[in-house]
Swiss-Prot record:
Its main location: membrane. It comes from Staphylococcus aureus (strain MRSA252). It is a multi-pass membrane protein. GO terms for cellular component: plasma membrane. The chain crosses the membrane at residues 30-50, 55-75, 77-97, 104-124, 160-180, 207-227, 242-262, 298-318, 323-343, 362-382, 399-419, 428-448, 452-472, 491-511. One of its GO terms (molecular function) is symporter activity. InterPro entries: SLC13A/DASS. This is Sodium-dependent dicarboxylate transporter SdcS.
């Protein structure tokens, strides 16, 4: 257990060191300083010199603030969450929306869905249920190196459907490093050292990649999918249900995990180490250290199952009853959260109830503000006439094969998100694609869904996504190795996303990909 804690501390230090090389911090990096100036400059230049005849002044104004906000999001000139507050100032100034209309977008149902999801995830982490679930999955799968690799991927992928990708990887990487240490300590005389090194690299990357892949399974698994749900509702007035997305997302996760596992085990890091000395023993030892499931764990497990059932059955059960017909996914998330605040804990030395307001310190408020900013900006784009104008300009793409557009969008976003925040990428790209769908005459989800899924899938660089930074911080993998392996996982993801969106999603969601929806 000491080794486990030691490595968790080591990862945190390396993770922080990666992002802060120098002790003497400058107020702005060169890139941030350029972005800080470029954003307002683009705003002014657009207002002064961009006046197309068929775009009203309000549309020009919203385009100008979109360029400003997008520039600050990409360069992170100021914190992304702070940039996301700009619509509250700029949209009323241009008489696009009233302050009340703008502010209401920051309290959208989608934001409360994610807030409730965060609270449930923190409850799992507080009472260590997440660790028990992960270790149990690994223990059940087996002791060969291939099965251990698969076990870690399944456990991490499952966790990241319900807790953040970052949290899932932070939970699993110390356990993985403990197994790697055990492999080195117990290696037999005839064991090839190169094989152990290949196994450790494959295991570290498997954990990071599975954390990213698993987020695609549910609407609360990763921010880009929450943004997809919100933008789709904002632009077209239609809803993506939690249950239906799981029918699309979970098979995608299973296929991606399976192919990535095969690639890591038999192509990228092929080795001769078939069984890991002491691997299964170590997992069982850690399970024994957890002891029997405690009261608080049972409560969180029950609440988790209840939340899942309510989300899954809302479309075909709750909507049929008059009393619950108006219940949304966010309503369920907050109901579940309130239950966690009410139910008392037995281990009162730690906490009086399952969750208390101390949880507020751990909640990612910045992410929630970013969602709100994206929704407010989307409403401004719609209300100002900018969305309609963009659609007219994009009509030149009419006649281009929809599958070709999907391929270009998926690959473009996949590689863009390697150097930009996945949340900011989705927030910027999805409103444009909503308009593009009308212009080219296809269903909006045909363009928006692959972009949101691709925005989540960054595998090449440590800066691409926090899970990548965490596994890089383990010291077991170099940037060059991550980039070369991640490039192929990017391409695998692109192929799977395109196939799922084009052939499976329309059947599951009951949509006609060649039938556009009118903008609200």
């Amino acid at each position: 257990m000491a080794y486990f804690n030691q490595h968790q501390s080591m990862i945190s230090k390396r993770y922080l060191t990666f992002f802060s090389k120098s002790k003497k911090k400058k107020p702005f990096s060169t890139g941030q300083l350029i972005g800080l100036i470029l954003g307002p400059l683009l705003f002014l230049l657009t207002l002064l010199f961009f006046h197309p005849q068929d775009l009203p002044w309000k549309g020009v104004y919203v385009l100008a603030i979109t360029l400003w906000i997008a520039t600050w999001w990409i360069t992170e000139a100021i914190p992304i969450a702070a940039t996301s507050l700009l619509p509250i100032v700029l949209l009323p100034l241009g008489h696009i929306l009233t302050p009340e209309q703008v502010s209401s977008e920051y309290g959208n149902d989608i934001i409360f869905l994610f807030l409730g999801g965060f609270i449930l995830a923190i409850a799992m982490e507080r009472w260590n249920l997440h660790t028990r679930v992960a270790l149990t999955i690994i223990n059940l799968i087996g002791a060969s190196t291939s099965k251990i690799l698969l076990g870690f991927m399944v456990a991490t992928g499952f966790l990241s459907m319900f807790v953040s990708n970052t949290a899932a990887v932070m939970i699993m990487i110390p356990i993985g490093l403990a197994i790697i240490k055990e492999a080195h300590d117990l290696q037999e005389a005839n064991t090839n050292q190169t094989s152990i090194q290949k196994f450790e690299k494959s295991l570290v990357l498997a954990i990071g990649y599975a954390g990213t892949i698993g987020g695609l399974g549910t609407l609360i698994g990763t921010p880009p999918l929450i943004i997809l749900k919100g933008q789709y509702m904002q632009h077209f007035g239609h809803e993506i249900s939690f249950a239906k997305w799981m029918i699309v997302g979970i098979p995608t996760v299973i296929v991606l995990l399976g192919i990535t596992w095969l690639y890591l085990r038999y192509v990228a890091f092929r080795h001769d180490l078939k069984y890991l000395p002491g691997g299964q023993t170590l997992i069982k030892q850690k399970l024994d250290e957890l002891g029997k499931m405690k009261y608080e764990e049972k409560v969180v497990q029950t609440i988790f199952v209840l939340a899942s059932l309510l989300w899954i059955t809302r479309e075909f059960l709750l909507k049929k009853w008059e009393v619950t017909s108006s219940v949304a996914d966010g309503t369920i998330a907050i109901f579940i959260s309130i239950l966690l605040f009410i139910i008392p804990a037995k281990n009162t030395e730690k906490h009086r109830r399952i969750i208390d307001w101390e949880v507020a310190k751990e909640l990612p408020w910045g992410v929630l503000i970013l969602f709100g900013g994206g929704l407010a900006l989307a409403k401004g784009i719609s209300e100002s006439g900018l969305a309609k104008w963009l659609g007219e300009q994009l009509k030149s793409l009419n006649g281009v094969s929809p599958i070709l557009i999907v391929i270009v969008i998926t690959i473009f976003v996949l590689f863009l998100t390697e150097v930009t925040s996945n949340t900011a990428t989705a927030t910027m790209i999805l409103p444009i694609l909503a308009t593009l769908s009308v212009a080219v005459g296809v269903h909006p989800l045909l363009l928006m869904a692959p972009a949101a899924m691709a925005a989540n899938c960054a595998y090449m660089l440590p800066v691409g996504t926090p899970p990548n930074a965490i596994i890089f911080g383990s010291g077991k993998i170099s940037i060059k190795q991550m980039a070369s392996v991640g490039f192929w996982v990017n391409l695998i993801s692109a192929i799977i996303i395109i196939l799922v969106v084009y052939y499976i999603m329309p059947i599951v969601l009951g949509i006609d990909i060649n039938q556009p929806l009118p903008l609200k």
